[in-house]
């Protein structure tokens, strides 16, 4: 049996692109092979603003948070997994799918399993960025080696993080690289595959997205119709208040999918490829891709469906102008995205997991 231990997050709760939904799909499609244990949302800590709040934080809050993260939260994971422990056999495999997050730690769970069930295989997925680990290892240089020790393999969703782990001293054979999945039953085109005039460009996501640079690109491309899906990020003041610019706050998944369906191009001005679900869902919805050439983006895209840019305003402007009026090129790129998205289906995640043992 393969046991999937996953964290539910408010930001992806109930949608068709998060880790929990991936687990739902695996359990539904392969019920005799997978079981899932879902950790509820972690406790959130409000920003400290007033003087009184700062005093309270120093007196009580800081210690309370430390105790929650180091004691309470790991204990909650152990309680969650009690039914699994009662049935665990040496041939079973455990997948920890939110690994290396100190504020939602699965490390203590990994150590407990390794100590009490030494023959059970443990695979731990991390979908963070090299920049994140740079910041964390500046505080704790042994962090990656420490967290890697109790698990059999570290899993990643892109070659850039795999390379980072290898350079950090993790043996190559202890790392396995896969892809972010896409739910192709949910993310599929409803509108005819055609190019719009003016060109419709959509931008989505908040993680590792450079809104300042995007705003400058928008200003230099006034003859493009822009759909800026900023989520809960308050960046409205950066963009021109003109009819060709639609600024959209948090959207229900169905509405976001519709906006992708009516667009031509997915523009991704990124500092890294964290949040790869934006890339994979864009491809499944048949969008031509303009992307920052960072992280693991070339694991997902190539020159047939994407234009790669350095993080430079003029490169993005040039890419957009290359597609404007070139309907044949846009159509070819859209078709290529659709075709490439087929290798990101849930069946391929299952094949990846099967090959690990």
Question: PLM features: residue spans?
Answer:
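Nucleotide-activated donor-binding/catalytic signature segment of Leloir-type glycosyltransferases, i.e.
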Residues: 230, 235-257
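Acidic anion/phosphate-binding donor-loop and adjacent secondary structure
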Residues: 134, 166, 179-198
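A charged, aromatic-enriched C-terminal amphipathic alpha-helix characteristic of glycosyltransferases
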Residues: 13, 327-357
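Conserved donor-binding/catalytic core segment of Leloir-type glycosyltransferases
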Residues: 193-209, 215-219, 227
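Short acidic/histidine- and often glycine-rich active-site loop of Leloir-type glycosyltransferases
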Residues: 238, 294-308
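Conserved acidic donor-binding segment of nucleotide-sugar-dependent glycosyltransferases
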Residues: 303-314, 322-327
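A short, active-site helix/loop in glycosyltransferases that binds the activated sugar's phosphate group
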Residues: 151-174
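Acidic donor-binding loop of glycosyltransferase active sites
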Residues: 261-274, 287
């Amino acid at each position: 049996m393969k046991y999937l231990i996953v964290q539910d997050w408010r930001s992806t709760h109930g949608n068709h692109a998060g880790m929990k939904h991936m687990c739902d799909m695996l359990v539904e499609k392969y019920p005799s092979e997978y079981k899932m244990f879902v950790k509820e949302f972690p406790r959130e800590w409000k920003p400290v603003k007033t003087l009184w709040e700062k005093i309270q934080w120093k007196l009580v809050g800081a210690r309370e948070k430390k105790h929650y993260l180091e004691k309470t939260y790991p204990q909650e994971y152990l309680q969650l997994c009690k039914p699994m422990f009662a049935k665990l056999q040496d041939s079973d495999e455990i997948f920890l799918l939110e690994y290396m997050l100190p504020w939602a730690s699965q490390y203590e769970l990994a150590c407990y399993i390794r100590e009490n069930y030494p023959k059970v295989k443990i695979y731990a997925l991390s979908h963070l960025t090299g920049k994140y680990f740079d910041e964390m290892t500046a505080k704790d240089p042994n962090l990656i080696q420490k967290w890697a020790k109790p698990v059999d393999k570290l899993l990643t969703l892109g070659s850039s993080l795999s390379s980072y782990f290898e350079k950090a001293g993790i043996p190559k054979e202890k790392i396995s690289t896969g892809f972010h999945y896409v739910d192709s039953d949910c993310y599929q085109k409803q509108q005819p595959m055609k190019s719009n005039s003016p060109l419709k460009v959509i931008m989505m996501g908040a993680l590792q997205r450079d809104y300042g640079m995007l705003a400058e690109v928008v200003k230099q491309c006034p003859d493009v119709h822009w759909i800026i899906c900023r989520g809960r990020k308050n960046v409205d003041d950066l963009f021109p208040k003109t009819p060709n610019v639609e600024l959209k706050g948090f959207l229900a998944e169905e509405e976001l999918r519709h906006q992708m369906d009516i667009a031509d191009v997915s523009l991704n001005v990124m500092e890294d490829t964290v949040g790869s679900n934006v890339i994979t869902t864009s491809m499944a919805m048949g969008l031509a891709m303009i992307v920052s050439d960072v992280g693991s983006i070339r694991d997902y895209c190539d020159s047939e469906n994407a234009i790669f840019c350095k993080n430079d305003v003029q490169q993005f402007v040039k890419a957009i102008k290359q597609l404007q009026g070139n309907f044949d090129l846009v159509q070819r790129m859209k078709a290529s995205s659709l075709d490439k998205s087929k290798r990101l289906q849930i069946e391929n995640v299952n094949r990846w997991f099967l090959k690990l043992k």
